[in-house]
């Protein structure tokens, strides 16, 4: 039993090393592509080329390029022997690393004129078929496939577990602290500490409006029943009683706002603690989400993008942002500022749309060009 546990621990550690090497190589390949796009007009990085930037900046760019290329080569040598254990998303990441490394490998021989390349003896596709058949006939291929399946299963379970922890732990901490810790403490201390039940202008305005409506209801009820109007003394007594009730309601709402703030802070701290403790699981969750997202078809990706943009930055998004901001203000006991809401609606969706378009241009256009083409077609060519 101990031997099996040790072997399982070793295989999991080997899988983690493989995943880390692949992630480091993939991030380095993306860095090289970003350097190509930003400084070399989407062409190869050429150290001998003088850029229209200061020499210190060019030296930094070349230093980052060489370091990233070395990481890609090291990652490729580590991951390639275990290619059979990779899932489709990881295979796409490996293909990107191979593309970047082959671009700077210098193995492509050019003719004397420098305009043509020497023809290959066999097509690469045919060589790929031979390599696939060789891997399938390899005696160790079954073990490699089983190991890859187990690693993907463990990755899925770890992703679901950390996802549940990220959702449930902050919610439970917020509810428990609000009910059993923060709530009783604030209610006990609020009569002695004035800042825990500070008056709020919007609550006073609501209370005055309710008191005015109550007075009109008394007069209307007397008219309906054919009774004499209430005397001034009796009316003052009833209004005083109602004013005391409204004051208690306003104080309770003020205390509840303080409870919400403290309980939400406790939930936020719990979320941060979970993130700090589970960094490795968060990397696994990131890979799982990438695989789930990139496993969608091009039409599904384009549909999700259009749905997201229409909800948050579309034509009807101002109404949604207004409701959301009003709810947040009421939750924390803050006054609703119409000018702030209008300013937020006029600026934040525009900033969000700009960031989203930049992401499509810099990242999605490289990773999935067909999704961008489908998105343009579904969005009316825009």
Swiss-Prot record:
GO CC, alphabetical: plasma membrane
UniProt KW Cell inner membrane keyword: yes
Record has DNA-binding as a keyword: no
Topology within the bilayer: Multi-pass membrane protein
InterPro entries tied to this protein: CemA
Localization annotation: Cell inner membrane
Annotated transmembrane regions: 162-182, 257-277, 305-325, 340-360
Principal location: membrane
Keywords linked to the UniProt accession: Cell inner membrane, Cell membrane, Hydrogen ion transport, Ion transport, Membrane, Transmembrane, Transmembrane helix, Transport
GO MF annotation, one: proton transmembrane transporter activity
Function noted in UniProt: Required for H(+) efflux immediately after light irradiation to form a rapid H(+) concentration gradient across the thylakoid membranes. Together with PxcL, contributes to transient H(+) uptake following dark to light transition.
Family: Belongs to the CemA family.
Identification of the protein by name: Proton extrusion protein PxcA
Species in which this protein is naturally found: Parasynechococcus marenigrum (strain WH8102)
Name of the gene encoding the protein in the UniProt record: pxcA
């Amino acid at each position: 039993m101990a031997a099996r546990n040790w072997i399982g621990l070793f295989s999991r550690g080997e899988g983690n090393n493989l995943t880390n090497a692949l992630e480091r190589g993939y991030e380095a390949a993306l860095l090289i592509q970003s350097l190509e796009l930003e400084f070399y007009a989407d062409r190869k990085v050429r150290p001998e080329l003088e850029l229209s930037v200061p020499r210190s900046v060019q030296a930094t760019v070349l230093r980052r390029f060489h370091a990233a290329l070395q990481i890609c080569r090291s990652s490729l040598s580590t991951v390639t022997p275990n290619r059979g254990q990779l899932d489709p998303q990881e295979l796409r990441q490996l293909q990107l690393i191979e593309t970047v490394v082959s671009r700077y490998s210098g193995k492509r021989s050019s003719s004397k004129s420098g305009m043509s390349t020497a023809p290959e003896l066999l097509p690469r596709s045919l060589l790929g078929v031979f390599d696939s058949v060789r891997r399938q006939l390899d005696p160790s291929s079954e073990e490699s496939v089983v190991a890859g399946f187990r690693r993907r299963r463990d990755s899925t379970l770890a992703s679901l577990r950390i996802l549940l922890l990220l959702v449930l732990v902050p919610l439970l901490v917020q509810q428990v602290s609000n009910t059993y810790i923060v709530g009783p403490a604030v209610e006990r201390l609020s009569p002695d500490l004035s800042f825990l039940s500070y008056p709020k202008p919007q609550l006073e305005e609501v209370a005055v409006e309710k008191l005015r409506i109550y007075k009109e209801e008394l007069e209307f009820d007397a008219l309906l029943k054919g009774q004499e109007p209430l005397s001034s003394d009796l009316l003052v007594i009833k209004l005083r009683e109602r004013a005391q009730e409204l004051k208690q309601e306003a104080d309770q709402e003020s205390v509840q706002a303080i409870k919400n703030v403290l309980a939400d802070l406790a939930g936020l701290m719990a979320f941060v603690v979970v993130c700090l403790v589970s960094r490795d699981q968060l990397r696994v969750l990131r890979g799982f989400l990438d695989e789930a997202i990139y496993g969608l078809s091009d039409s599904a990706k384009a549909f999700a993008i259009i749905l997201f943009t229409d909800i948050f930055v579309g034509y009807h998004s101002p109404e949604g942002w207004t409701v959301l901001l009003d709810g947040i203000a009421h939750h924390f006991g803050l006054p609703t500022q119409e000018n702030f809401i209008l300013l937020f609606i006029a600026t934040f969706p525009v900033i969000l749309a700009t960031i989203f378009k930049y992401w499509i241009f810099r990242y999605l256009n490289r990773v999935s060009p067909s999704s961008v083409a489908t998105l343009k077609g579904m969005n009316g060519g825009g």
